[in-house]
Regions:
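Extracytoplasmic small-molecule ligand-binding "clamshell" domains
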Residues: 33-102, 106-109, 172, 239, ...
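Ligand-binding clefts/hinges and TM-proximal coupling segments of bilobed small-molecule sensing domains
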Residues: 75, 152-171, 243-271
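Hydrophobic/proline-rich hinge and linker segments of small-molecule sensing/allosteric domains
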Residues: 41-45, 113-134, 225-227
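Ligand-binding cleft/hinge of the Venus flytrap
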Residues: 65-72, 115-116, 141, 151-173, ...
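Flexible hinge/capping segments at coil-to-helix
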Residues: 125-145, 160-161
Length: 271
């Protein structure tokens, strides 16, 4: 009887040890497939409408960053800085990540991307400018446009901004708030906005003196920005996989539904 119990005990022990080894191996493989967390990483947010507000420490990109960091298992230091500074640090490799970035030929040389939403750009223009399309704004040489420094848009809007830049008809700012102020003062007559900015327009007096005009561009993909100087192509692919998992399981859609109607949230995140 004692011998029988011992044999059974040894059998169960072998099964238990085998299962533990398999679980350990699976955990090791999962860790190997995830991003490398051997050093502290850095991510910068920028203030921009519903994407992020430093005043309340809330926004779409804050929610996205929290979930991304949690899934990665890495230690990531999150800061807030101007968009122009973010691009400089991404290019130099002094910053690993930022969010809601769009690509360009120049940026593709130093940054990788993992797309998680797509949206259109619009021209917010003063009613007294009597403008109904980009062409009529451009044709009136007295009209000035305000843009956030280092921002790029869709192809048609980029060409529009570049032509006005050549004519010295651009006023730059670090963020939206200064542009709203000088638009109200008629120092500029138009500015480029996104759906993230609608709530700010609707909640202030500027709504009564402006009109939103379609730029004619299609939706532009936005995503996680990754520095090619600080992250290898292999590591970028791992972060891209994390972002894709957040899209696939509906996490990105649920984040956007906190800030937009279900219809608009789906239009921006399912593409």
């Amino acid at each position: 009887m004692v011998t029988l119990l011992t044999r059974r005990g040894m059998w169960f022990m072998r099964r238990w040890v085998g299962a533990a080894l398999l679980l350990g191996l699976a955990g090791h493989c999962a860790a190997a497939d995830g991003p490398a967390c051997g050093r502290p990483l850095t991510l910068a947010l920028h203030e921009h409408g519903l994407l992020y507000s430093a005043t309340t420490d809330t926004g779409i990109d804050k929610d996205f960053a929290d979930e991304l960091v949690k899934r990665s298992g890495c230690r990531v230091t999150v800061s807030v800085m101007a968009r122009a500074r973010i691009w400089e640090l991404i290019e130099s490799g002094a910053l690993d990540f930022s969010l809601s970035g769009i690509t360009s030929e120049a940026r593709d040389k130093f940054a990788g991307f993992a797309w998680y939403f797509s949206n259109k750009y619009y021209l917010l223009v003063r009613n007294d400018a009597k403008v109904r399309e980009l062409a009529s704004f451009e044709a009136n040489t007295k009209l000035q446009l305000g843009v956030i420094r280092s921002f790029r848009y869709g192809p048609k809007t980029n060409q529009f901004v570049d032509r006005l830049t050549a004519e010295n008809r651009i006023t730059y700012a670090a963020g939206l708030e200064p542009l709203y102020q000088i638009l109200a003062l008629d120092r500029i007559q138009g500015m480029i906005i996104e759906p993230f900015d609608y709530s700010q327009v609707a909640g202030r007096a500027i709504r009564d003196i402006t009109t939103i005009i379609d730029t004619g561009d299609g939706a532009v993909p936005h995503g996680l920005i990754m520095s090619k100087r600080s992250l290898t192509a292999t590591e970028q692919a791992k972060w891209q996989a994390l972002v894709q998992s957040m899209r696939a399981d509906g996490t990105v859609l649920r984040i956007f539904e906190k800030y937009f109607s279900p219809e608009l949230a789906r239009a921006m995140t399912v593409f």
